[in-house]
Amino acid sequence: MSEPDPEPRHLSPRQAFDLLQEEPRAVLVDVRSNMEFLFVGHPVGAVHIPWIDEPDWEVNPHFVRQVRELMLGGVICDNDAGCAPVVLICRSGKRSTEAGRVLLQSGMREIYNVIDGFEGERDEDYHRSTLGGWRFEGLPWEQC
């Protein structure tokens, strides 16, 4: 029987923010589309590497390479400090979980997912940012 695919570690938005403040090597990667990143807003300091994007809405075939380049080839690991954390965020935590699985399968280690993402799930009126997420928690964000 095969082992289940590795899962990224899940953090609340506040836990992710705290990790990013405490660990200077940590990087926050926003995996949402260009439109979401630009027009909905994004966490301050996030690096944008889309997991799925327009025009075809297919998985970015260069995603792992782009994250590795961001992390200096994936070699930001040492015996004393371990590996630099990569924190992934999307709208509600689903795409970032998928992206995190792929990074783990590629051999990267310290991969985290922000549960509830930037906007969280929709409420009964189909509104976002009312139940959870980075914005709901009042964490720093900006809009282009």
How does the language model describe each region?
Residues I89:
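Short, surface-exposed ligand- or partner-binding patches at beta-edge/loop junctions that are enriched
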